[in-house]
Amino acid sequence: MSEVEKKVIDLVVDKLNVEASEVTREASFSNDLGADSLDTVELMMNFEKEFNMSIPDDQAQEIKTVGDAIDYIEKNLK
């Protein structure tokens, strides 16, 4: 498991109050983890802060699963 993956999982667990075992790469933020639209926006902001990066709104809308977030961050991390 990469450092990015660990941090993303920790942020999701903290924000959505779910068990780490529920946070898989395939888990959908809304369908599987119970996030509403505000939770999702706040998660993206938390990812931006944690990884010191910007996630444009059009890209954030495409990030629907934990794996999507990990892949996006790893690809765009400076």
From Swiss-Prot:
Residues 1-77 form the Carrier domain. 4'-phosphopantetheine is transferred from CoA to a specific serine of apo-ACP by AcpS. This modification is essential for activity because fatty acids are bound in thioester linkage to the sulfhydryl of the prosthetic group. Pfam families: PP-binding. InterPro entries: ACP, ACP-like_sf, PP-bd_ACP. Keywords: Cytoplasm, Fatty acid biosynthesis, Fatty acid metabolism, Lipid biosynthesis, Lipid metabolism, Phosphopantetheine, Phosphoprotein. It comes from the Bacteria. One of its GO terms (cellular component) is membrane. Coiled coil: none annotated. GO terms for molecular function: acyl binding; acyl carrier activity. Signal peptide: none annotated. SUPFAM superfamilies: ACP-like. Pathway: Lipid metabolism; fatty acid biosynthesis. It is found in: Cytoplasm. Gene3D superfamilies: ACP-like. The modification O-(pantetheine 4'-phosphoryl)serine is found at S37. GO terms for biological process: lipid A biosynthetic process. Carrier of the growing fatty acid chain in fatty acid biosynthesis. HAMAP family: Acyl_carrier. Belongs to the acyl carrier protein (ACP) family. This is Acyl carrier protein.
